Regions:
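A structure-centric signal for secondary-structure junctions around beta-strands
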Residues: 9-10, 44
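N-terminal auxiliary segments of SAM/dcSAM-dependent transferases
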Residues: 1-8
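Short, solvent-exposed loop/turn motifs
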Residues: 2, 19-20
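Short polybasic amphipathic segments
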Residues: 10-16
Length: 170
């Protein structure tokens, strides 16, 4: 886990040498991500966030006045580092009364969640193939905990694969 200051994008979170989020444009991603689900179903009683360690999706759910937010995050260190160095993104979402953090493997944790619990589920995992396959493998579990007419919004990899970076900043 690294926070690097990039000239064009400001501070950015890197995990395993891959950029995850940058201060300069994060709000566009998180706002669009949350609002795209709300455009399909405006119910905001209860949301689940799978991943999203930078806190941007949690911040947007809070700003949209969700009643309750269960945030399933594998690594509390990612959240802590982002709270410390990218505090404008998450705005200390973990400290809000409406947010309950569940640390560990999200897909193991949701096995104990009752059916039809969430109005919205936001799957905000890394872009790597492992996370994409993991989310796809567990889609039926996500559907089980989703209320009727609920919406799953998922971050998916671009259709365009870029094999080599043009420039690496360290």
């Amino acid at each position: 886990i690294e926070i690097l200051d990039l000239e064009q994008f400001g501070k950015a979170l890197f995990i395993d040498n891959e950029i995850q989020v940058a201060e300069s444009d994060e709000h566009l991603y998180s706002s669009t991500f949350v609002n795209s689900g709300l455009n399909l179903n405006s119910n905001k009683e209860k949301a689940a966030i799978i991943g999203g360690g930078d806190g941007g999706v949690a911040r947007e759910c809070i700003s949209q006045n969700f009643g309750f937010i269960d945030w399933y995050e594998l690594d509390p260190e990612v959240v802590d580092v982002c709270d410390k160095h990218l505090s404008k993104i998450g705005e200390k979402a973990t400290e809000k009364n409406s947010v309950k953090c569940v640390w560990g493997d999200a897909f193991e944790s949701i096995k104990s969640v009752k059916d039809n619990t969430y109005d919205q589920i936001f799957v905000d995992l890394n872009d790597d193939q492992f996370c994409i396959d993991l989310a796809a493998k567990n889609m039926s579990s996500l559907e089980r905990i989703l209320k009727p007419k609920g919406v799953i919004t998922a971050q998916v990899l671009s259709l365009i694969h870029i094999s080599e970076p043009t420039r690496r900043y360290r």
